[in-house]
C-alpha cells in the first residue's frame, strides 16, 4: 500500500518525507487556501509555483486540482499543471464536464486523479475515462451517516472484476482506522493528513514498553 500526504503545507510534506514512508502528495484548493497568508494577492501563478516546490520535496505523484468547471478551461489548466513537473497528476472533479476533461487529458498522456467520488457508478466512469487514480472521500460520507469504507470495498471489487488499471486512492481520511480498513480492503493508496500520520505511530503499549526498557537500560548502564 502506498502512503500519500494530504496537505499543501511544505513543512508538513518535508517532515512526512523524512520518515521515509511517503510515496506522494495530494492537494486541493481548500488545502492551499489554508496556507495562504493573503488570499487576495495569491495568483494562479503562485499556485503553480507552490506545486513546483512540492515536487522538489517528494519524488512521487503530486496531485494538483483544476480551479475551474468548464471542460475547455479544465483541459487548459490541466495541461498547464502537467507541464510543471513530470510527477504532477491533474485532479478533476467527477462531473459531466470533468469527465470530458479527464478523457481528453488522459488521452494525451496526462495522468488524472478523479476527485470528489462518492458512488461506485462514479468510480466506474472515472476508470472508463482513463483516470490513473480515483479518490473516494470516505470521511465526508461518514459525516452524513453513510459508511464511507463500504464505498472503497465496492470500488476495489469492481476494479478487480474488470482489471481496471485505475488505482484506488482513499481520501478524506479522518483517523488511523480508515487507513487500516483501506489496507484490508486492498486499496492501492491512502492519502493521509499530517496529524493522522503521527497517530499511526502511536500505541500506549509501545509507550509503556519503551519506558520500561529505558528504565531497565539505565540500571544496566549503571552496572
From Swiss-Prot:
Cellular component, GO annotation: cytoplasm
Disulphide bond pairs: none
CDD domains for the chain: Transaldolase_FSA
Annotated localization: Cytoplasm
Pfam family, one: TAL_FSA
SUPFAM superfamilies per record: Aldolase (SSF51569)
Function: Transaldolase is important for the balance of metabolites in the pentose-phosphate pathway.
Family, similarity comment: Belongs to the transaldolase family. Type 3B subfamily.
Protein name, as recorded: Probable transaldolase
Organism of origin: Chlorobium phaeobacteroides (strain BS1)
UniProt gene name: tal
